[in-house]
């Protein structure tokens, strides 16, 4: 048996894993290419090297593979230049994660980091403003202009961000909730 699903589609493919480096994500250097179906030309899967308003998603200790996959899809949908994951985040190559990315895993570069605060400091040295999602953020998300280089820091489903990680952020933002909803599940 080669599938982990009950009713596989009967299709098998081999895909090379690409291992990105943080430096590639920050510099926008091509780490890989794909062919644009419309033009037939090879294009970088990391994006425009000259892009000034870079956007990153930093996630800490995400446990559910489906949630991580959803974050990849959301990252691609908003034009994220990369996703940075703490070393205790679920395996990006978990079959459920891969399925839930709906292919975004092949188009959005990503790295794992052993030192999330150290990585945040590297981003800050590269003039990237770090916004931490926090239930008790100092301001609501719509109080800021995100047109500059930005990274959004999202914590784990059950505990949110660790205090020391949240303290590394430049700003803490909240998303107002209606009703009795407390968070957006990561």
PLM-predicted stretches and their roles:
Residues 1-186:
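Post-transcriptional modification and biogenesis factors for structured RNAs
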């Amino acid at each position: 048996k080669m599938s982990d699903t009950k009713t596989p589609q009967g299709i098998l493919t081999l895909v090379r894993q690409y291992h990105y480096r943080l430096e590639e994500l920050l510099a926008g250097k091509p780490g890989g290419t794909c062919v644009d179906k419309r033009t037939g030309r090879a294009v970088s899967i990391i994006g425009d090297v000259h892009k000034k308003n870079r956007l990153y998603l930093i996630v800490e200790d995400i446990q559910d593979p489906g949630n991580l996959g959803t974050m990849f899809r959301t990252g691609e949908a908003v034009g994220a230049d990369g996703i940075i994951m703490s070393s205790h985040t679920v395996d990006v190559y978990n079959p459920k994660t891969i399925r839930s990315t709906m292919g975004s895993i092949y188009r959005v570069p990503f790295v794992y980091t052993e030192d999330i605060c150290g990585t945040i400091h590297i981003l800050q040295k590269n003039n990237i403003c770090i916004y931490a999602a926090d239930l008790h953020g100092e301001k609501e998300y719509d109080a800021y202009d995100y047109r500059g280089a930005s990274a959004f820091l999202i914590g784990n489903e059950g505990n949110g961000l660790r205090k020391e990680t949240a303290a590394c952020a430049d700003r803490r933002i909240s998303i107002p909730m209606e009703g009795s909803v407390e968070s957006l599940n990561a």
